[in-house]
Amino acid sequence: MNAAAKAGKLARAPADLGKGGVPGDAAPGAPGAAPLAKEIPEVLMDPRSRRQYVRGRFLGKGGFAKCFEISDSDTKEVFPGKIVPKSLLLKPHQKEKMSMEISIHRSLAHQHVVGFHGFFEDSDFVFVVLELCRRRSLLELHKRRKALTEPEARYYLRQIVLGCQYLHRNQVIHRDLKLGNLFLNEDLEVKIGDFGLATKVEYEGERKKTLCGTPNYIAPEVLSKKGHSFEVDVWSIGCIMYTLLVGKPPFETSCLKETYLRIKKNEYSIPKHINPVAASLIQKMLQTDPTARPTIHELLNDEFFTSGYIPARLPITCLTIPPRFSIAPSSLDPSNRKPLTVLNKGVENPLPDRPREKEEPVVRETNEAIECHLSDLLQQLTSVNASKPSERGLVRQEEAEDPACIPIFWVSKWVDYSDKYGLGYQLCDNSVGVLFNDSTRLILYNDGDSLQYIERDGTESYLTVSSHPNSLMKKITLLNYFRNYMSEHLLKAGANITPREGDELARLPYLRTWFRTRSAIILHLSNGTVQINFFQDHTKLILCPLMAAVTYINEKRDFRTYRLSLLEEYGCCKELASRLRYARTMVDKLLSSRSACNRLKAS
């Protein structure tokens, strides 16, 4: 999140400047003022519009700002509010930077650009009211998923290009396109945000000289300081495309100097498994000579977009596990691909539905990946426990909070009937699953009809309640028994959810294994999440090795998510520390049982 300007400068700006706003990239963990949250008023008043906002939950922090949910007192509409203390913004360049952000961003309005809804100040703070992007950014998606499928990458890249085309038509160079500045709304639509480094081209042929950008995405002409223009955004999109498909940035090293050297030398390699058409477009965008790169307006005419399958929508499940594309095999076949203009009509041309029972089963998540996740989690917990986080002179647990790491899925209910059938559970999206005693799994989606069946070897197949083989009849009957047992009223509400386009591509994480101790039940999901529910006080831990984070639900049902590395730095209360020690023992037990199981299979 970029620093805002001190209000003294803003007060001298034109009166209507206060109606603008600028999105900020909430980079949790960046240095900020610790006492900020205590000083911010609970009710915020925009003196121009007389709109009143009530401050809600913390969303993130970065630079000089903190971000909170704020709700309009009259309409109850919720926005993210970026709040900057004036006391921290005293330098002239900070004021200039904020003025530039506002003057640029207030002039923009596009489907794929973060919107703003207000900008005002009081004697102590500057407030910016933004468009809410509930699904965070592509950075969190990248941390959870690493390399995406090609159709997903194409889906996101197309929207990034459309947003950037709009910027360039309006003579704006973003200059800091990166995963963390590409936000996602509830429909997984991309919104370009954070215009802190953006600039306006004042005349044709103007070359900017400022050194700016993020190391992994910075263009060589910016590093050389010979002048740069619109082409830097195309370079950044090339880096983004590489990252989405390969799982890491093209020039990334552990040393900043080495990264810059690689960028200047154009030293990167594309793995052989990447589609040659995709590799070709990456190479076109990552040319050292900016004039040799395609313009932003030429990109969507590339074969990567015109001949490849682009989903009209993606399901929320894609944030944590790959989707399934077997429902549209003809669209994926190069010999029968629709042109971009047809695919991009979205809702007007939904993908053809196909009988679910004919879908090819999909096998995902190897044992090696699962063990790797558990090993990572064990190492993360070992590290935080070794720091003795509760034994500090000053514990600042709130500084370790990172809402961007909130889990996508967790188990909200469970019932143990393993003496006869298995363990039933409900996920937070109201889908219901059963891990049967024969090690097969069956999941009923929250639409009340779609089914996902996972065989003992991990092979997945997709069916419906109304269309399934007779061999599954008993298991579907048992699943319905579990479903009714786990609060019929709540699940009826879930079953009434209107299916949205893209849901036909959904795959849900499933329960891989579980066990009980005297103190807790331990649940291990296929997306790497480990959940521990404590019996005595009903507290819960939800651990994610991919985000290196823990969500703690205390006795009062307060839901807080922390980065483990920040708990190591800032400390935590004794209650959380003791549960983290217990969690390490349980993860070690999970890992040991998997290793023993694999040794048995090998012998």
Swiss-Prot record:
What is the annotated quaternary arrangement, including any partners? Interacts with CEP170 and EVI5. Interacts and phosphorylates ERCC6L. Interacts with FAM29A. Interacts with SLX4/BTBD12 and TTDN1. Interacts with BUB1B. Interacts (via POLO-box domain) with the phosphorylated form of BUB1, CENPU and CDC25C. Interacts with isoform 3 of SGO1. Interacts with BORA, KIF2A and AURKA. Interacts with TOPORS and CYLD. Interacts with ECT2; the interaction is stimulated upon phosphorylation of ECT2 on 'Thr-444'. Interacts with PRC1. Interacts with KIF20A/MKLP2 (when phosphorylated), leading to the recruitment at the central spindle.
Task: Write out the PTM section of this UniProt entry.
Answer: Catalytic activity is enhanced by phosphorylation of Thr-210. Phosphorylation at Thr-210 is first detected on centrosomes in the G2 phase of the cell cycle, peaks in prometaphase and gradually disappears from centrosomes during anaphase. Dephosphorylation at Thr-210 at centrosomes is probably mediated by protein phosphatase 1C (PP1C), via interaction with PPP1R12A/MYPT1. Autophosphorylation and phosphorylation of Ser-137 may not be significant for the activation of PLK1 during mitosis, but may enhance catalytic activity during recovery after DNA damage checkpoint.
Which residues of the sequence carry a binding annotation for ATP? 59-67, 82, 131, 178-181, 194
Q: Which reaction does it catalyse?
A: L-seryl-[protein] + ATP = O-phospho-L-seryl-[protein] + ADP + H(+); L-threonyl-[protein] + ATP = O-phospho-L-threonyl-[protein] + ADP + H(+)
Enzyme category, top tier = transferase
- Role, per record: Serine/threonine-protein kinase that performs several important functions throughout M phase of the cell cycle, including the regulation of centrosome maturation and spindle assembly, the removal of cohesins from chromosome arms, the inactivation of anaphase-promoting complex/cyclosome (APC/C) inhibitors, and the regulation of mitotic exit and cytokinesis. Polo-like kinase proteins act by binding and phosphorylating proteins that are already phosphorylated on a specific motif recognized by the POLO box domains.
Q: What is the lineage of its organism?
A: Eukaryota, Metazoa, Chordata, Craniata, Vertebrata
What is the gene name? Plk1
Q: Where in the cell is it found?
A: Nucleus; Chromosome, Centromere, Kinetochore; Cytoplasm, Cytoskeleton, Microtubule organizing center, Centrosome; Cytoplasm, Cytoskeleton, Spindle
Tell me which family the UniProt entry assigns to this protein.
Answer: Belongs to the protein kinase superfamily. Ser/Thr protein kinase family. CDC5/Polo subfamily.
Any idea of its EC number?
A: 2.7.11.21
- Which residue stretches does the UniProt record annotate as biased composition, category Low complexity? 1-15
The species this protein belongs to is Rattus norvegicus (Rat)
Name the record gives this protein:
Serine/threonine-protein kinase PLK1
